[in-house]
Amino acid sequence: MIGGTRLLPFRLLAFGPAATRQPTTALRRSRVTLTGAPRGIYLGLGSGSGLNINNRRWESTTATTATASSSRPKSDDVAAEVDYGHIVPRANEAALYFDNIFPLGLSAILWRRWGTDEDFSEQLLKRFEKSSFGFGITDPISMVKRSIPKSLPIKVTEIIPRLKDGGAFVKFSHGPETTPAEIEESLAKSLQDRPVKPWFNPFTSVRVNAVKGVPWLEDLYRLPKARLKVEFCPPKELSKDSTSTELSQEALYGLFRRYGKLSEITPQPSDSKVTPRFAHVDFVRVRDAVMARNCLHGLTISQDNSATRLRLSYEQKVKPHKIWEWTTSHPRIVIPILAALLAAFTVVVFDPIREFFVRAHVQGSFRVSNSRLYRWFKRRTADVTNSVFQRHHDKGEQAGLQALWSQRKDIIDSVQKWLLETADTFIVVQGPRGSGTKELIIDQALKGRPNVLVIDCKPIVEARGESGTIRKLAVAVGYRPVFSWANSLSSMIDLAVQGTTGVKSGFSETLESQIVKILHTTASALKKVSLEQYQKDGSGAEISEDAYLEAHPEKRAVIVIDNFLHKHDDGGLVYDKIAEWAAAMVQSNIAHVVFLTNDSSYSKSLSKSLPDRIFRQVSLGDLSASVAKKYVLGHLEGLDRDESLKDDSSEVSRDDKGAENPSEDDIEAESKRRRDLAELDGCIDTLGGRLTDLEFLARRLKSGQSPRNAISEIVDQSSSEIIKMFLLAKKSTESTQTQWSAEQAWFLIKEIASKTSLRYNEVLLSPTFASSTTPSAADGEAAIEALAAAELVTVTSHRGRPQTIRAGRPVYQAAFTQLTQDAVLKARMNLLLLTELSKVEAKNIDKVETELALLGALPKQPREVTDRVTYLLGKLHSSQVKISELDREMAMLKGVLVREV
């Protein structure tokens, strides 16, 4: 009866009174007989060397009085060496295996052999005989003794501890009147009535089972596992070529169930060629597997005239990684989830840090000029710096700037008034480049106002690649840390995942999503900046945040977007997203938004974001002649005062008792200054009132040039720029990058030089703009807008419609005149213009000839087509006359090019 199941066909060939198997001669010869002492076990490792199992403390208790060389078998006795390490009792001897004697966890620490030759067998037996039932509860020998009742008719002859398995083998002798099965049953009943609790785990008790097989006492590093590999081997008594019978699952269950709960029995696959045949028996607990291995290893079972010897070994159970397998088999679900988790982690960790840096950037928390130490030092040294630097150097420039700001005081007051009103619309300041729009708004209209964020679109649009665009935008708003390089890496990962799984992972972000993310974080930071006073006042109980922002427009932050629509064709996405974000800012009353642009067609772009709003707009023009003169004289006055300051020391050294007569150099310098001032009025009329041109003139005058020479060089430089950028540009560049042609640019230059201003619609109807042969310049209106964006011309509007076309800068008027006076350039450009007109007329002739050929192919000439044929013939004649005239003019121009240098 095994585990409650009666196995009739089996006969256990183990040891005990009824055992028929006896140790072989080699085994008996290999063991050492001790007088009055238990038998020991010896393991041979090779010729000339030996290893006693008791070399490991608590692992073996072989007692021997002989030396290793005398106790081991001879080197030629191979059969004896093969059987070393097995427990083979004699008649009336049996073995029990006690579990829960040692902790299993110690086997991973004390797996190595201990370097000692001590003999513990006699000591263990003495301790077993002397130990009491009431003391030494932590002593394993005491636990073994307490587990064996005194009334049990057995005599313990040997104790073999197994630290690795957490138990111990106990060999005993018994009388012929008892059997090992009865002794096992008595021990089990005794432990059930009086359980022995181990000290290391009081929730379990010591278990005991009879050893039915031939245990193998090895000291290999094979830690116990819950899975046993059961190999079905032929018995040793049979021949090597004999086969064994594979046990069924029912038989294995009957053998192993008594030792513990089984979770699974897995037989060897039928198509497997591995021999010997095997099966896997999985226990729920590891100690149950240890008990089964130590009790059943080497058990021989006979069935139907065949015998099978069981060979048991531990085997690591392959755990089913269901989560990992599901994860790897569903990448289309897992990868987007991972991307979402990564995005959530970024939002939770980095967004508060980035928001903090944006607030610090807007409020200027990290600026040196806002620190208390800097302000204290500036107050202490203000008198010295003002007296040395500003009194003689900056007063002239300040005077010129004051004249400039006085002319534009109305604009400054209007902008400041709009910033104090509640209006959910944009403030747009439009002016040509060099008109001082940025200085007007930031230095004057917003002077002394806190919480101003300036976003310059020029470096953002001109940045190389998406990473550069993101980095420049982040720098403009103070958004940090920013990992612009990570998007390139994420794009590569996304591409690899898409190539393998067929679906995008979502790790990479588009340029649009990254821009929106940065602007969204900036909006959150700006809202906190605008509500800073609201939180300090504790107004939360009275009004809400939105109501507070609507009622206090002076508390809102100000966003200045400079160079809006700079290179409109290159940064359309950036401009659209900034405009949408700015619209959200003004509509939610978070901040005022001021756009600074030099593009007169800004309303097309901004109207997409605020289609139902009227913008508050200001247009800046050139300075008047009087203000421009004051501005230049202000710079020159500062230079004169610097020179007078340098001459103070020389004047003091002179005789100060009487008035000193001026020298000839002073008289000549004074007369030169008067001549320059007389020339300045005419030069300013030529130069115009563009602020950048006036500063350029002032710098040249400071260097010692006369106004006439300075103006001449400025005009020459402007002419060279026009020739290089508009007239002599390569055709490939024009067709791929520009929407205008050199012929159209020359047409405007020639006409503006003679008429100063042109009617917009008249230019559109001219053959050069209406029928251009350049593919990229076929749209005349787009060509004019492109030339205006390039600042060659300026388009003025009247009641919202384009009216006139003028030179892009006042100095360009003089440059246009100078270009038309160059005979060679004029002949060359007119030749190109006439050639294009000739091509236009030739195309008209081709169209007329095609239609005439179609009409002539009719079988009968109806009377109704007579008028059409007459019209076409007249048009053909007119075009041919024009071509003839153009050919004569082109011949004359070619003659000029041949003669002139």
Swiss-Prot record:
Bilayer disposition of the protein: Single-pass membrane protein
Domain RRM: residue ranges: 226-317
Localization terms from the record: Mitochondrion inner membrane
Gene Ontology biological-process entries: mitochondrial genome maintenance; mRNA processing
InterPro entries given in the database record: Mt_escape_2_C, Nucleotide-bd_a/b_plait_sf, RBD_domain_sf, RRM_dom, Yme2_C, Yme2_RRM
Disulfide bonds: none
Region Disordered, residue ranges: 644-672
Domain of life according to the entry: Eukaryota
Membership in a protein family: Belongs to the YME2 family.
Function: Plays a role in maintaining the mitochondrial genome and in controlling the mtDNA escape. Involved in the regulation of mtDNA nucleotide structure and number. May have a dispensable role in early maturation of pre-rRNA.
PANTHER family named among the record's database cross-references: MITOCHONDRIAL ESCAPE PROTEIN 2 (PTHR32198:SF2)
Protein name: Mitochondrial escape protein 2
Annotated gene: YME2
